[in-house]
């Protein structure tokens, strides 16, 4: 259904936008939903919803909700840029070997100073039956990173109503949050607890590689938590992410209802790894991109939580404006 305003008014349009996103309106819709295959609501029921008066308090609250949404949008755009830059650098340095090829041809590598260019060799050698930059090694993903599979968490129920960890399954990984998640025990081994910034890889069903920023949770089966004591987070995250298309291709050809990969595929997936010294120097360029991306994603989550706490009060009016402004500041 599309709303058309007889007398365009941006303030009123924004107000109705947020009213229609409020939990009170969603509850109203749920109580009047029709159909089974396709749930819908009648035009009469929609038009019968009683919209609270547009007071100065609600006007100010809408302004704050608009500001929150604007901040979220800018942070998401920034994160998309940070991710794109990190992936581009990784592909150029560790897949296409652009700096090495440039030096081999007697050219200065593009986009880097002399000190950075000096980190890359000027030729190739064979490693694991493939050419890699001289002094580097072709290595399997699971040779430098640990892929910890999650638990069947139905065997670890929560201790109580207020003492639990939300269960992170594929659905939560894709959504980036733990809303409506199952609950598990808080007494799991530490390695099965997921925290902001952890790298998660769903290896079955819908294959995804993500930097988790949805708050503390419990690692469910069919998800790997990826860690390493040998290489930095940015490297094993981008290396795993680089191989995701081929992992999806493998899973798509599995003769089962739920395509997946096996650990042998982690062993078969190779990437060129430089010396620890070179990797440490390159970390100075890429790690800040990933760290800022994580920091921004946590901010987005916090803004979303704030928005969700404000929305019910837009209708009820049960919040002083000074409190709202303090929350958004």
Functional labels for PLM-detected ranges:
Residues 1, 34-62, 217-224, 254-280:
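A short glycine-rich beta-alpha junction/loop motif
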Residues 1-21, 37, 169-170, 189-245, ...:
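A short beta-sheet element
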Residues 31-33, 154-162, 251-253:
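Short coil/turn segments at secondary-structure boundaries
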Residues 48, 52-96, 114-152, 276-323:
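Non-catalytic DNA-recognition/assembly elements of restriction-modification systems
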């Amino acid at each position: 259904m599309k709303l058309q305003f007889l007398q365009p008014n941006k303030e009123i349009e924004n107000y109705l936008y947020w009213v229609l996103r409020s939990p009170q309106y969603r509850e109203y819709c749920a109580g009047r939903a029709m159909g089974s295959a396709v749930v819908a609501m009648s035009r009469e029921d929609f038009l019968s919803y009683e919209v609270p008066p547009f007071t100065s308090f609600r006007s100010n609250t809408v302004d704050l909700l608009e500001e929150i949404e604007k901040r979220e949008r800018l942070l998401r755009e920034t994160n998309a840029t940070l991710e794109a830059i990190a992936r581009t650098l990784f592909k150029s340095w560790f897949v296409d070997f652009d700096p090495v090829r440039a030096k081999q041809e007697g050219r200065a590598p593009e986009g880097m100073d002399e000190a950075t260019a000096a980190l890359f060799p000027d030729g190739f050698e064979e490693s694991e039956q493939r050419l890699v930059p001289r002094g580097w090694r072709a290595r399997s993903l699971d040779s430098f990173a640990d892929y910890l599979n999650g638990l069947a968490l139905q065997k670890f129920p929560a201790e109580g109503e207020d003492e639990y960890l939300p269960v992170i399954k594929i659905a939560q990984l894709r959504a980036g949050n733990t809303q409506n998640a199952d609950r598990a025990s808080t007494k799991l081994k530490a390695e099965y607890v997921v925290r902001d910034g952890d790298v998660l890889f769903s290896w079955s069903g819908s294959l995804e590689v993500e930097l988790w920023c949805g708050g503390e949770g419990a690692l469910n089966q069919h998800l790997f938590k990826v860690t390493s004591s040998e290489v930095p987070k940015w490297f094993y995250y981008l290396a795993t992410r680089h191989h995701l298309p081929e992992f999806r291709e493998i899973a798509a050809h599995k003769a089962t209802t739920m395509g997946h990969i096996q650990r042998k595929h982690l062993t078969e997936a190779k990437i060129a790894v430089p010396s620890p010294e070179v990797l440490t120097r390159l970390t100075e360029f890429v790690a800040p991109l990933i760290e800022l991306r994580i920091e921004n994603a946590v901010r987005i989550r916090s803004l979303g939580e704030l928005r969700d706490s404000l929305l019910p009060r837009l209708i009820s009016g049960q919040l002083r404006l000074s409190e709202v402004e303090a929350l958004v500041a």
